[in-house]
Amino acid sequence: MKLTFRIEYRTAWGEELGVILDGNNSEPIILRTPNGEHWEGEAEMPDLPACVPVSYRYGVYRDGQCIRRESGTMAHLFCPGKKKNCHYISNDFWKDLPAESYLYSSAFSGDYQSETTIKVTASADGSITFRALCPCLHHKRQVLAISGDCPALGNWDIQKTVLMEEIQPNEWTITLNVSTLEFPLSYKFVACNADSKQVEEWENHDNRMLNNPELKKGEIYLTPETEVHFTSSARKVAGTAIPVFSLRSEKSFGVGDFGDLKKLIDWAAKTHQQAVQILPINDTTITHTWMDSYPYNSISIYAFHPMYIDLNQLGKMKDKEALAVFEARRQELNALPQIDYEAVNNAKRSYLKVMFQQTGRKVLASAEFKKFFEENEHWLLPYAAFSYLRDLYGTPDFSQWPEHTEYKAEEIAALCAPDSSCYEEIAFYYYTQYHLHIQLLDAGNYAREKGIIFKGDIPIGISRNSVEAWIEPYYFNMNGQAGAPPDAFSVNGQNWGFPTYNWEVMEQDNYQWWQKRFRKMAEYFTAYRIDHILGFFRIWEIPSHSVHGLLGQFVPALPMSVDEIQSYGLPFQKDFMTKPFINEEMLNKMFGDKAAFVKETFVQHAHDDIYEMRPEYDTQRKVEAYFSDKKDEESIHIREGVYALISNVLFVPDRKHPSMYHPRIAVQNDFIFGRLDWKEKDAFNRLYNHYYYQRHNQFWYQEAMKKLPILTQATSMLVCGEDLGMVPDCVPWVMDQLQILSLEIQRMPKNPKHEFGHVWEYPYRSVCTISTHDMSTLRGWWEEDYEQTCRYYNHVMGHWGEVPVSAPGWVCEEIVRHHLECPSLLCILSFQDWLSIDEEIRYPDVNTERINVPANPRHYWKYRMHLTLEELIKNKKFNEKLVEMIDTTGRF
């Protein structure tokens, strides 16, 4: 079998084009060119299997190294026939991201497997294979066909169209005898009903033309893979967002588990939803207390939290007395209105220990487990060792361990060896993770079978006391803390405590750390949310000595020199502008009758009415330590005030170049800004606005484009970005270029001139929602600010008269319907907001429905749905209402 590749691509001097066949580890097929633009090359491929799609990609090479390759997870395709002496001539265009790349994702394409053998018949006179890319068809409801101006293509008769075959998701092909065609050939693609085969729509394109390729005997001409679009086929989907821990079923053990996901998927399918979104599910076990309930502080980017295991799938416990005790405990915990994190985890861990003793050896000896271990050993072994050592030494802080503070693979391999004295304790973690893996895999496959997009969540950070920080410290900056500048969630900014990434080191191996993480996630999910996508442009890095986020700076960034600061007309005074400004008036105003105590304890007199921090309390961490055992309201007020003293500066020194500076974020609200005269304020504001909103756009664009194209194309999952907060102009540039779905929330409009977003103006390539886990629910928000609610009721909903203090069901239904009607591709609403439309089943206590309060770093994540999934599935009235709303808004 001979292959000829032809492509037009303009190269620079010294560059050449090559072709790599996927799955073929041989050297690239280097093409020839007469002019640096038209390239052609041949290869003999006698061993290619018949009737099986063959994929290949083009790349640009210089000095034998590939310097650029085609974008995306999509390759060129053709399907060889059974005849071995054929000559395939492929005519191609270079493939960058297709116009609707998100529709080619596994979220919409699924894991396609052809149900029949692909038929490719090559005629003696030569054949033409028409190739088309079409992501717009409704999966399993429509097929692609071709119609044209000759008898072989039906002479434009819609009853005689020629059906094509889908050889890969969205990739359609048909091979016709060249002698049956008439040239020049005019043709178009059409969408047909999969059952009746009747034409439902013609493609939105002029007639396509094909001249006679003048083929020789045995030659098969492959047309370029052209994109096909239809006007009326814009997909729109509705879905539900809910954490796994919040699920409740009749058989769950006080917390949602992976088994409950299948019931959630059943309910979603029953109500014509096509998406289910969850929060991160990785192991966060650090202290074995409720503090570990925060799902974004994982100790492993691969291991799942043991509390999500469905104990019912482990088999029957032989010890009947123990089983009875566990069943009583299960019923007790499952009856609680919220999660008792510590009780649930202790009980489920004890249950797992019993089952490990009963079935562990058999499971670990199975072929299925051995395959799992072989494929996951690179993370599973260090995770198990870390978990064992964490409990052995009573701390997750590996720098405090008496042994193994520095990860050495040989030592850890010996610790985890089957002949090790602690092997059984290590193997317990293998056993647990194996069952979690097969249960989540089962849930993910079930979602695919049901046509449900299964959307996961990629946290931006990791715990500084984590497996990855232990075994791969070179990937992280451990001397800083990741967070976010002040926003609607927190006036002092957010300090997540995560180490920041060492992107320079990650770039050296093409971001393999991230690519492996995404590929692992793709085993289970078909879509994912990039938590805080802004972190791939720049991260808000807070000094390790800070508690609040106000003293942070963007990394990477372009700090300002003293000369540049002064060029704005602002005379630079280092001590006044970079050290905490504290005077008598400020102390009295902030602390009132406690000002004397603050003077005696935390500050000391400098000169005139000016004070400075005492050395023993000159950082927020030192102050935090002083108040560690003081929890009364007055102490907390003083502590927060002293924090504010320390952050009362106009400029923050750059972390690497201390003679250069960053304007302190949101300083216009602090005392020091009030000390400036009007000219200085004007100069500072001009400097500030340029620095935060203009200076870095190109710089951060380039930073993001180093990383995100590689990461988003590492898998076929649908990519959604959480682009909230302080969003620079370059973020939508990158998201548009890479076709990443944005997040649209009406109460957090992207247009700063609007109080509320206009849902009808949302971009198609977006996810719209009413509230996220970091926000109050729809009903909770309605009750927060009555004046704002009135404006929304009048100006957005168009209603007048008395505004209800609490949102009645009809108000919630109207708001939900407006969101379903918006142009967004995905409308994924929180479970609580779906329930808000029905006053009979929604939970009476609005406040308990909130999942997280970002301003509180010690928030207890314990929300749980108040009714069971079984009850939800049986609620005919509510479910029929959802079906009506979803169907009439075109989302099914």
Spans of features found by a protein language model:
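Catalytic cores of glycan-processing enzymes that make or break glycosidic bonds
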Residues: 100-123, 127-129, 177, 211-892
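Aromatic-rich carbohydrate-binding modules that target alpha-glucans
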Residues: 2-52, 61-82, 133-183, 192-215, ...
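Glycine-rich, flexible loop segments associated with nucleotide phosphate handling
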Residues: 52-54, 811
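Extracellular carbohydrate recognition and processing domains
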Residues: 97
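Intrinsically disordered, low-complexity regions enriched in Ser/Pro/Gly/Gln/His and often acidic
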Residues: 31-33, 87, 163-165, 195, ...
